Amino acid sequence: MATEEHQRLASIVKSCHESLRQLTKEYGATAAWQEHTSPRNAKQLAEYAKAMKQLAAIWETNDGKVELQARSRIKWAIDYITKYFFTEGIYLQKRQREQRLLESYRAEGKLGEVQCRLMEEPPDRLHVLDVGSCFNPFSSAPHLEVTALDLCPATEDVLQADFLKVEVVPGIREPELEEGSVRRLPASHYECVIFSLLLEYMPSAEQRLQCCLQAYDLLLPEGILVLITPDSQHVGKNAHLMKNWRYSLARIGLLRVRFEKLPHISCMVFRKAISRELSQHWASIHREEGMCEEIRIPQDDS
């Protein structure tokens, strides 16, 4: 059962989300985001960041309880990243699968010659970009070199950034800041990008897709985008939305390689395919009626 403090913190988070959704209904997503991220709203954003950090601590520090451990989004993400790049070499298994798919599409005459890009052997420390990080929870993993970004950082090791406004630039190797905010990030640089509880914060389906397009450009070939989104429903309740996410991300070159429903969250991993054309062709043959290129969440219909 939630404690009084837990309920108070959750109320702060919910209030911030509802405020942004209301602004979006009144002024549209672009104007709403502009207002939400303006200095006039700095106090609410700071309260939100503090509440999110305290809420996370309630769950993440209860490692001894199996039920709470199962809910740990941080642990889940680190475990899969480790398996994908190191202990199980999943990236090689997925490469072979994509190469077989490519051969079959070519044999059927459905896809011509395409350029494939493969990842070199993963480094000992992976370059990870954690967007909407809040308090840099992945920094404790010794094999992750984390660049943490947030609209309103809760700790000093998180860089301030409005991800929707950040440029992805080829040829640079480090984030570039102006006036204390990240303005540019290196293209094709990261083995992993993490959106943990980020996309549902964005007020529109178009902005969520824009975030994913940014992630694609930031990732190295065969790198992964880890998506963690709130979901307290049973596993099939939001299946149509998750299918549409899978289709939409395949259209931009990201193929889903993992989906797991945990209590209160859904955890997904999408991989930058060896060929964008391959991913797009997969999407075209798996498209179902009513699917479209957008990232919708249940709150969009409320």
Curated annotation (Swiss-Prot):
Keywords, in A-Z order: Methyltransferase, S-adenosyl-L-methionine, Transferase
UniProt effect for mutating residue 202 to A: Abolished binding to S-adenosyl-L-homocysteine
Entry EC number(s): 2.1.1.-
Gene Ontology biological process terms from the UniProt entry: cellular response to amino acid starvation; cellular response to methionine; methylation; negative regulation of TORC1 signaling
InterPro entries reported in the protein's UniProt record: Bmt2/SAMTOR (IPR021867), SAM-dependent_MTases_sf (IPR029063)
Binding site for S-adenosyl-L-homocysteine: 73, 132, 150, 162-163, 196
Cystine pairings recorded for this chain: none
Annotated SUPFAM superfamilies: S-adenosyl-L-methionine-dependent methyltransferases (SSF53335)
Effect of loss of the gene: RNAi-mediated knockdown in the whole organism is embryonic lethal. RNAi-mediated tissue specific knockdown in neuronal tissue, glial cells, motor neurons or muscle cells is embryonic lethal. RNAi-mediated tissue specific knockdown in midgut is viable but results in reduced adult lifespan. RNAi-mediated tissue specific knockdown in eye imaginal discs is viable but results in age-dependent eye dysmorphia with loss of cilia. RNAi-mediated tissue specific knockdown in wing imaginal discs is viable but results in severely deformed wings.
Residues annotated as binding S-adenosyl-L-methionine: 73, 132, 150-151, 162-163, 196
Top-rank EC class of the record's enzyme: transferase
Pfam families: Bmt2
HAMAP family from the UniProt entry: BMT2
Family (UniProt): Belongs to the BMT2/SAMTOR family.
Listed PANTHER family: S-ADENOSYLMETHIONINE SENSOR UPSTREAM OF MTORC1, S-ADENOSYLMETHIONINE SENSOR UPSTREAM OF MTORC1-RELATED
Function: S-adenosyl-L-methionine-binding protein. It is unclear whether this protein acts as a sensor of S-adenosyl-L-methionine to signal methionine sufficiency to mTORC1. Probably acts as a S-adenosyl-L-methionine-dependent methyltransferase.
The protein's name: S-adenosylmethionine sensor upstream of mTORC1
